[in-house]
Amino acid sequence: MTSPEGAQNKEIDCLSPEAQRLAEARLAAKRAARAEAREIRMKELERQQKEVEERPDKDFAEKGSRNMPSLSAATLASLGGTSSRRGSGDTSISMDTEASIREIKDSLAEVEEKYKKAMVSNAQLDNEKTNFMYQVDTLKDMLLELEEQLAESQRQYEEKNKEFEREKHAHSILQFQFAEVKEALRQREEMLEKHGIILNSEIATNGETSDTVNDVGYQAPTKITKEELNALKAAGEGTLGKAKEVEVKKEIVEKVGQRETLQDSEQEQPKLNTGKDCVDRGVLHPGEKAENQRPVEDSALSPGPLAGAKCEQEVQSQDQENTSILKSPEQIESHEVTNKSDSRDSNSPEPSSCRGGLDSEVSGPTALGIKNQSENSMDSQGKENQEDLGKGSFEPRPDHVLGQTPEIDKVSCTDSRGTGGNHLEDVVQAGDTIVEDQVGTMASAEQSKSMENHIGRSLNDGLGQSSERELAHEAAELEEALTQSSQAGGENTVTEAEDAAVRDEKPLQADVQATPAAPTVQSGHQDTTGPGSTDTKHTSPHAKERNKAKSEQQAEALDSPQKKTKNKKKKNKKKKAAAPMETCKDANEESSCQDPDVGDGEEEERVQATDKKWAAETPELKEDPQSRPSGKQNDAEEDSGPAEGPTDVLDQNSLQCADGDISPVGRKGPQRDASQIGGEEGLVPSQHPGQADEKGIEGHSVDNSDLSGELGGFNSESGEQAREEVGNSKSKEDCTMS
């Protein structure tokens, strides 16, 4: 069978051209109809699309899914060519194609709308995303800030925690202290109640000022702050303050009293020192030169205490100085030499002050007589020393001077006031004054002389006795002697004569101390006389009488061993009286051997003094060969002194024999003349002008030798023995005068 298209083609081919034209017109008509149908369907789709857009998006997918099959069905129907009209095949195909195109366009439009919507929503979401990102950044910044705040807060927390711990510890301590203070306050209240003390009141309930308030803080071993202690003390000062003021006032009064007593004691010390200065001027200390003595002598011119106080002080100081003299006799001799040499170059008023220290013991008119005679004796001594230096002979001088008394050293000070002049004229003037004072006062002179001798002995007694006992004996003897003597002219004569004798006798003091048989009495006053010594011969008897009495009194004070040796020495003296003596040359040689330590200055002085003395002694030996009746007793008394001295005396005694070169017989003639003169004139011992001076010179030489023994062998003697010696001296003096 054939197809319809083949059949139609066969018909066209069969028809005429006219038939072909009509067929084409019908095809064009069909095509136009189909286009119109498509446009109508498109409009309907658009209308439906608008409705879909107005619906929610949920329903959009559902509607689209429902419409698609319909559209697809319509399009498929149109595209299938299955039209309701029977037409050609071309018309049906075109109608389906258009419908499908329209549906595709509608779906495209919908997809584009959906895309647009998706793009809008995407942009919105993007905006939201950026917003959220910004918010996240800000939140992160806030988080960092918060983290920093958290760290700071943690640090502060730690600090606060530590501070809290400290505060907690301090709080615990304060609580403990608070408990202690509370306990202390409780104890304080208990103490106050116990003692009945009311604070902040001037009067206590019990009427007593108790110190318990100040001691409350120390009662218990608890700790109390300074404020509380100050409060307690301030509260306690109410009653206790007055007591403290009273104690302070008492202390002030005691201090003022002590100052006044110190001032009084300081004022008394210069007075004591003035008394001691007088004695220091009288005695040259060992190791001290005459130049050093002068300031002390000047200081003694100042006013001091009463004469009685001076006497006691001088006695004590003399005893102490006698001990120092015994220890170093060599220094004493050397100081005497230097004092003499210095005295010839300078004339000073110091000797009067030196002598005044010891002579102040004599009061009344005696002091005036002493002053007059001291000036005369010092003038005569100065002349004698100058003459001694003018001669160029040598005299031995021992290194040791034994038993020098403070009087000897005192007179050494007086040598410094030596002036030129005729010595014999001075002696005559002194003798005139002595004779005037001695007329009718023989008994009183003897008593005063014995008193003075005993004073000299008692001063040396201080070596063995205590100072208190010595002062007691000395005061008793002074009072007894002053009551017995109505006038002290004789004493003045004796003291001044002794001063002159000491000045002349110093170079020969050691030589006087001889062996028991050697004649020890040498008149130092003979040094001043030349070949014709007639005046000296006339003045020597009375001096020897005084010398004899003085030596006897001092020998009486020796110990029992010394008294036993007197008889032996008298016998030896008689046997050795006529013994030959060494020559002056041999004596000078021996002295040069014995004195190796003596300086050149001392040797020159000794040579000059020796020549002068030998020139004075030789004429006397020729003119006075007679013996005196009492000369042996005097020699025996002189020998008893050096027997107790040191062993150095033996060597010196041999020199004495050579220096003396005389026998005891040569000195007895003037004594006999003096006894005759005394018998003719009665109580007046001698009126020759120079007798007193000569007697003092020889008497003091014996006194020096006796005192050397006294210082060596004295033990403690009582005042009774001194009184017995005074009586014995009186009786012996009467015997010699008869």
Swiss-Prot record:
There is a cross-link at K249 (Glycyl lysine isopeptide (Lys-Gly) (interchain with G-Cter in SUMO1)). Residues 314-326, 371-380, 483-495, 520-534 have a biased composition (Polar residues). The modification Phosphoserine is found at S16, S83, S84, S88, S92, S302, S346, S348, S551, S560, S675, S701. It comes from the Eukaryota. Pfam families: LRRFIP. Induction: Up-regulated after artery wall injury (at protein level). Residues 94-194 form a coiled coil. InterPro entries: LRRFIP1/2. Residues 78-94 have a biased composition (Low complexity). Residues 479-580 are annotated as: DNA-binding. The keyword RNA-binding does not apply. GO terms for molecular function: DNA binding; DNA-binding transcription factor activity, RNA polymerase II-specific; DNA-binding transcription repressor activity, RNA polymerase II-specific; protein homodimerization activity; RNA polymerase II cis-regulatory region sequence-specific DNA binding. Residues 40-98, 253-738 are annotated as: Disordered. Its main location: nucleus. The modification N-acetylthreonine is found at T2. One of its GO terms (biological process) is negative regulation of transcription by RNA polymerase II. The DNA-binding domain is intrinsically unstructured. Homodimer. May also form higher oligomers. Interacts with FLII. Interacts with MYD88. Competes with FLII for MyD88-binding, even in the absence of LPS. This is Leucine-rich repeat flightless-interacting protein 1. It comes from Rattus norvegicus (Rat). The lineage of its organism: Eukaryota, Metazoa, Chordata, Craniata, Vertebrata. The gene is Lrrfip1.
